[in-house]
Swiss-Prot record:
UniProt xrefs under Pfam families: Glycos_transf_4 (PF00953), MraY_sig1 (PF10555)
The protein's role, per its UniProt record: Catalyzes the initial step of the lipid cycle reactions in the biosynthesis of the cell wall peptidoglycan: transfers peptidoglycan precursor phospho-MurNAc-pentapeptide from UDP-MurNAc-pentapeptide onto the lipid carrier undecaprenyl phosphate, yielding undecaprenyl-pyrophosphoryl-MurNAc-pentapeptide, known as lipid I.
Name this polypeptide is given: Phospho-N-acetylmuramoyl-pentapeptide-transferase
Chief place where the protein resides: membrane
Pathway: Cell wall biogenesis; peptidoglycan biosynthesis
Topology relative to the membrane: Multi-pass membrane protein
Principal EC category: transferase
Keyword vocabulary terms for this entry: Cell cycle, Cell division, Cell inner membrane, Cell membrane, Cell shape, Cell wall biogenesis/degradation, Magnesium, Membrane, Metal-binding, Peptidoglycan synthesis, Transferase, Transmembrane, Transmembrane helix
Gene: mraY
Domain of life: Bacteria
Length: 360
């Protein structure tokens, strides 16, 4: 919205500042953080009253989790309120990439909201049907993938690039759509599986958002993209503003989600944020780098896949409990040890992922 003021820059010179992505990214970050800080208590109190018993606690989970009973969920509403309001104010609304990323985030968030609603009302960890949920997620993601492919310059817009190898580019043609949809849905559900302890998911999400904000800015700048020999994707620099809003909203949410959490993110937030990261990775042509930067989320998702698959084949479990953060709790790690150590892993993986920009 503020980009509109640049039309009057000839008469009011200070309005030129809104042309700069870096300035608007900082503004988006501060704005979303303030929105969550200011409206967070009201939203939390409202959810606590409406939800009553709050998010149900898994009966087979660590004993320390039972003291969290009664904590409200759907904290993603706070996060998305901050992100959407901030993006409407600071982002360039003429960018198709901004709208696609927000569409996926809102769509996935709506699915998560319905899932959270069913869990709270039924007081059960059985929410939305898994098949129906995945079906709707893939539909939303496929529409987004098609839009991204058409918005770019073919055949590159439907191609897959690889880190470390600058010349290796594979044109997926129409197979790009199912591949990109898989990345978006996979990212959304991987973040969802990570969100099991106070503060565990939101910090790695912010780390990944900061990393991809940097990647988006570089990918959308012809000079930087040429210097680093990464693929130039016009218009994706604007996604740095969106991810700046994610970081700000994440900081605001962490204030209330710090242990002992006053509210849980819920599927409302985790699916929305994960889907957003996956969509940005697809738009910037850094899908494989997402698996590195978001390696913590990949590890959490793989632990569940391995646990379920191995149990179905042998009747035995690989981990004491899945996702893997619960395994370490069962091994005797305190919740704070698991959370902080996983944060460290997320930061290290982000640095490795960012190093791929230069190591080509």
């Amino acid at each position: 919205m503020l980009m509109f003021l640049t039309h009057f820059a000839e008469h009011v010179t200070p309005f030129n500042v809104f042309r700069y992505i870096t300035f608007r990214t900082g503004g988006a970050m501060i704005t979303s953080a303030l929105i969550v800080f200011l409206f967070g208590p009201t939203i939390i109190n409202s959810l606590r009253v409406r939800q009553g018993k709050g998010q149900p606690i898994r009966a087979d989970g660590p004993q320390t989790h039972f003291k969290k009973a009664g904590t409200p969920t759907m904290g993603g509403l706070m996060i998305m309120t901050g992100i959407l309001a901030s993006c409407l104010l600071w982002a360039n609304l003429a960018s198709v990439y901004v709208w696609v990323v927000l569409m996926v985030s809102v769509g996935f968030g709506a699915i998560g909201f319905y899932d959270d609603y069913l869990k709270v009302t039924k007081q059960s960890d059985k929410g939305f049907s898994g098949k129906a949920r995945l079906g709707i997620e893939f539909l939303i993601a496929a529409i987004a993938a098609f839009t991204i492919m058409r918005a770019g310059q073919e055949p590159f817009s439907s191609s897959l690039t690889f880190p470390f190898v600058k010349q290796l580019v594979i044109n997926l043609s129409w197979f790009f759509i199912p591949f990109a949809a898989f990345v978006m849905v996979g990212a959304g559900n991987a973040v969802n599986l990570t969100d099991g302890l106070d503060g565990l998911a939101i910090v790695p999400v912010m780390v990944a958002a900061a990393s991809f904000g940097f990647i988006a800015y570089l990918s959308g700048n012809a000079i930087f993209a040429d210097y680093l020999q990464i693929h130039f994707v016009p218009g994706t620099g604007e996604l740095a503003v969106v991810l700046g809003a994610v970081i700000g909203a994440g900081l605001g949410f962490l204030w209330f989600n710090a242990p002992p959490a006053a509210i849980f993110m819920g599927d409302t937030g985790s699916l929305a944020l994960g889907g957003m990261l996956g969509t940005v990775a697809v738009a910037t042509k850094h899908e494989i780098v997402l698996a590195i930067i978001g390696g913590l989320f990949v590890m959490e998702a793989l632990s569940v896949i391995i646990q379920v698959g191995f149990f179905k084949m042998t009747g035995r479990r690989v981990f004491l409990m899945a996702p893997i953060h619960h395994h370490f709790e069962k091994k005797g790690w305190t919740e704070s040890q698991v959370v902080i150590r996983f944060w460290i892993v997320a930061i290290i993986l982000a640095m490795i992922g960012l190093s791929t920009l230069k190591l080509r």
